[in-house]
A protein has these predicted regions:
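Signature of N-terminal electron-transfer/Fe-S-associated modules in redox systems
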Residues: 2-173
């Protein structure tokens, strides 16, 4: 069940959502009381963004709203507030480098500069081939003991050196 409707009673916009994403959304909806279904929006948007290529289209946000049974504006508010969501086309692999205090003191700024030089892009840009997107700076990613660190596609990489970064980037083709 989804809200007060079964999965078979979907709207045309639900065609944007894969069966895998619908299952993931349903799993999150089941964790909350029916009057708190908005609590599943972040998980739903994250699943959709990952599933459809790294950013949220208006059609995808509409489909999430329809599927969960929320006003579209509530989904747009979440998608545009949190830095984990992209609403424009970006590279396939999302890179976030922590440059907060622990990472900064351990070379995070140098790691970021190395990535910018290696990829030929600045923060907020994608490579011309669409392979990488260097996200705007994230807040602390809570891996201070193993600084400097970065995330690529939500996977943590810690104790970075320029050589380790090159190996990581080479694996993400």
């Amino acid at each position: 069940l989804r809200g007060n409707r079964s999965v078979s009673e979907t709207t045309a916009k639900d065609g944007v959502l894969s069966e895998h994403v619908k299952h993931e959304i349903d799993t999150w909806l089941a964790k909350f009381p029916p009057d708190r279904k908005r609590s599943a929006v972040i998980a739903a948007l994250r699943a959709v963004q990952h599933d459809i290529g790294g950013y949220l289209t208006r059609e995808a946000m509409d489909a999430v709203a329809d599927y969960i049974g929320l006003p579209k504006v509530q989904v747009y508010e979440v998608a545009t507030f949190y830095s984990m969501f992209e609403t424009k086309p970006v590279g396939r692999h999302h890179i976030s480098v922590c440059t907060n205090i622990s990472c900064m003191l351990c070379g995070g700024e140098e790691i970021l500069a190395h990535i910018e030089k290696r990829l030929g892009i600045k923060v907020g840009e994608s490579t011309p081939d669409g392979r990488f997107y260097l996200k705007r700076e994230e807040e602390c990613l809570a891996a201070c003991n193993n600084a400097p660190m970065m995330m690529v596609d939500h996977v943590y990489y810690e104790n970075l050196t320029p050589e380790k970064v090159d190996e990581i980037l080479d694996r993400h083709k």
